Amino acid sequence: MEKTFIMLKPDAVQRGLVGQIIARFEAKGCKLVGMKLMSVDQALAEQHYAEHKGKSFFEPTVQYIMSSPVVAMVWEGKNVVALARELMGATNPANANPGSIRGSFGMDISRNVIHGSDSVASAEREIALYFRPEELCDYRKAGEEWLSE
């Protein structure tokens, strides 16, 4: 089953939005298989955003993600990477669907409350950065048979 990495950024944690955001993933039938509240250090932040090194927003993004705890999560489900992207909405909340997570809670492009993997390959890389294999739970979720054929 496909997995994706989701991070609730410092603004989501500080604004008390964690429960509301998790509820949206659960309501769509996604299965939570890993979660931790954590502080991101410089090395991890730089690894996470390595593809943006050299861009003007790299350093401010690294500093921001280290500024307060984040909630790192792994969700599992059918086409969960694409589903999560749809739930999150456009990166810039000004362009996001009003019903999406960013459309509902995001303040601006840098305070957009959530990060999600943009592909299966990115999900695998990001999950490996934040979780050891034994930290992910493999279980049968009650009611799974009602979610898809």
Curated annotation (Swiss-Prot):
Keywords: ATP-binding, Cytoplasm, Kinase, Magnesium, Metal-binding, Nucleotide metabolism, Nucleotide-binding, Phosphoprotein, Transferase. Its main location: cytoplasm. GO terms for biological process: CTP biosynthetic process; GTP biosynthetic process; UTP biosynthetic process. ATP binds at residues 9, 57, 85, 91, 102, 112. CDD domains: NDPk_I. Signal peptide: none annotated. The keyword Ligase does not apply. Pfam families: NDK (PF00334). The keyword Endoplasmic reticulum does not apply. Its EC number is 2.7.4.6. Its cofactor is Mg(2+). It is found in: Cytoplasm. One of its GO terms (molecular function) is ATP binding. The active site is at 115 (pros-phosphohistidine intermediate). It catalyses: a 2'-deoxyribonucleoside 5'-diphosphate + ATP = a 2'-deoxyribonucleoside 5'-triphosphate + ADP; a ribonucleoside 5'-diphosphate + ATP = a ribonucleoside 5'-triphosphate + ADP. NCBIfam families: PRK00668.1. This is Nucleoside diphosphate kinase. The lineage of its organism: Bacteria, Bacillati, Bacillota, Clostridia, Eubacteriales. The gene is ndk.
